């Protein structure tokens, strides 16, 4: 369901040949002195925990002859576990630079590997592990700041292409986090509406049934990731 909605949405926008010419680079929207304070974060852990996957992407990048693509996907396991992504997105050419457990913090640290030196026509960002109900979580405000840091950097490197921010999705495994997810989604939606070149895509609303309850038939057994119905 999420996949079909997004595929249709993305394809329509990619067909708009004038879109890229109309995108303007916004001024930096994040203002801070020296650093963003983040609690419960071990720098070594966040730097090295997924180094194996980053090394694999570095190896791929060295042998990648054509770095152009219609869509560059950045994010966490919900992108990584989209098993049929190449088939579902066909005939669009995609490049996936996602890894399970990715958070905004390590995505920024690994930015040069996962997000630079490519030639995409659009970029999709989906990451939700900064608000996952763990001791390492950021606050909603910190998460929003890191989203802006990431999108600002993407827009500096790719000033003429559209960037799609997928909303946080509710899940059975993280139901207690839904109130925070709704707040961050509201912030991201407003931010995208005021920033040229950014588009917010709501993938949360369609996961509820007619009774207002979160659907159970669209999740894998872990209650977090989507199955083929989702």
Language model regions located:
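Conserved beta-strand elements of the Class I
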Residues: 72-74, 95
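Active-site segments of SGNH/GDSL-like serine hydrolases
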Residues: 126-132, 152-183, 204-208
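Generic structural signal for well-ordered alpha-helices
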Residues: 111, 147-152, 185
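Non-membrane alpha-helical structural segments and their capping/turn regions in soluble enzymes
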Residues: 137-148, 178, 182, 228
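Catalytic His-Asp segment of secreted/periplasmic serine-dependent ester chemistry enzymes
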Residues: 170-230
């Amino acid at each position: 369901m999420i996949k079909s909605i997004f595929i249709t949405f993305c394809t329509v926008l990619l067909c708009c040949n004038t879109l890229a010419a109309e995108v303007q680079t916004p001024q930096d929207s994040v203002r801070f002195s020296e650093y963003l304070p983040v609690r419960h974060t071990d720098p070594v852990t966040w730097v090295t925990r997924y180094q194996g996957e980053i090394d694999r992407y570095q190896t791929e990048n060295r042998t990648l002859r054509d770095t152009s693509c219609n869509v560059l996907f950045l994010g966490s396991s919900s992108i990584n576990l989209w098993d049929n992504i190449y088939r579902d997105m066909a005939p669009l050419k995609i490049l996936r630079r996602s890894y399970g457990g990715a958070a905004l913090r390590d995505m920024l640290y690994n930015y040069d590997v996962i997000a630079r030196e490519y030639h995409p026509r659009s970029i999709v960002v989906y990451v939700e592990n900064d608000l996952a109900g763990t001791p390492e979580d950021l606050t909603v405000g910190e998460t929003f700041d890191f989203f802006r840091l990431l999108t600002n950097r993407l827009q500096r490197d790719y000033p003429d292409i559209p960037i799609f921010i997928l909303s946080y999705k509710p899940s059975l495994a993280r139901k207690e986090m839904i109130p925070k997810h709704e707040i961050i989604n509201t912030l991201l939606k407003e931010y995208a509406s005021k920033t040229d070149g950014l588009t917010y895509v709501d993938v949360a609303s369609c996961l509820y049934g007619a009774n207002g309850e979160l659907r159970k038939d669209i999740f894998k057994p872990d209650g977090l990731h989507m199955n083929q119905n989702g």
